[in-house]
Amino acid sequence: MNISKLPPLSPSVIRRILFYLLMLLFCQQLAMIFWRVGLPDNSPVASVQITPAQARQQPVTLNDFTLFGVSPEKNRSGALDASQMSNLPPSTLNLSLTGVMVGDDTARSIAIISKDNEQFSRGVNEEVPGYNAKIVSIRPDKVVLQYQGRYEVLGLYNQEENSADGVSGAQLNEQLQQRASTTMSDYVSFSPVMNDNKLHGYRLNPGPKSDSFYRVGLQDNDMAVALNGLDLRDEEQAKKAMERMADVHNFTLTVERDGQRQDIYMEFGGDE
């Protein structure tokens, strides 16, 4: 069929063809509008969040395995029961205990230790001078040390008792009496008073030799705020005061009673 021989389309035919095409497009648009408006909205599809399962067990590390077993848990407080205390050997360290200050709060207790004619004040969990030994407990008449993996006892009279060899009984007895007569704790008991973790002074009470305590004018539960000019409310100055007590035989206590302060002079070391 030869297209060139077809008769040309008249303008009326062309207009008619264009009209039908426009009508077809119009009907298509109407159908799409009806489809969107007439039908209900699709319900949202519930989303499911998938997360990997969490491990319920702790991961195993190399530190969990030991070649020789696990050592027992350390006693952080340093407290030992009565049976352990009674079986502890005396310390072999070249130290002497010259005084102790024990309060209700064991963490605030102070031990005064002498080494090479020097005085040091140490508390619980602190190392003693000259040795890799730590204080784990402070008692009224002794301290317990931890040295090279074992516990040892350093008593107030260790030095005299250990030097008994070559000393006569009379000389040893004289040394012990002299030591006992110059121990400040025989006259006054100091107990630190804490408030909001701050040192407010030391509560005073009579020691075994209570006559001297009351004779100088002290009363039960007096609050000491200074000793020989050192502020007992400052922990560093309080430690210095405790260190010096072993070398002095008289001191001035500043006590606070009923809101008033007064200085009380006390001398010890002689026969009471």
UniProtKB/Swiss-Prot annotation:
It is found in: Cell inner membrane. InterPro entries: PDZ_sf, T2SS_GspC_N, T2SS_protein-GspC. Coiled coil: none annotated. The chain crosses the membrane at residues 17-35. It holds the Pfam family T2SSC. Residues 36-272 are periplasmic. GO terms for cellular component: plasma membrane; type II protein secretion system complex. The keyword Electron transport does not apply. It comes from the Bacteria. The keyword Transmembrane helix applies. Keywords: Cell inner membrane, Cell membrane, Membrane, Protein transport, Transmembrane, Transmembrane helix, Transport. GO terms for biological process: protein secretion by the type II secretion system. Residues 1-16 are cytoplasmic. Its main location: membrane. Belongs to the GSP C family. Involved in a type II secretion system (T2SS, formerly general secretion pathway, GSP) for the export of proteins. Required for the translocation of the multiple pectic enzymes. This is Type II secretion system protein C. It comes from Dickeya chrysanthemi (Pectobacterium chrysanthemi). The lineage of its organism: Bacteria, Pseudomonadati, Pseudomonadota, Gammaproteobacteria, Enterobacterales.
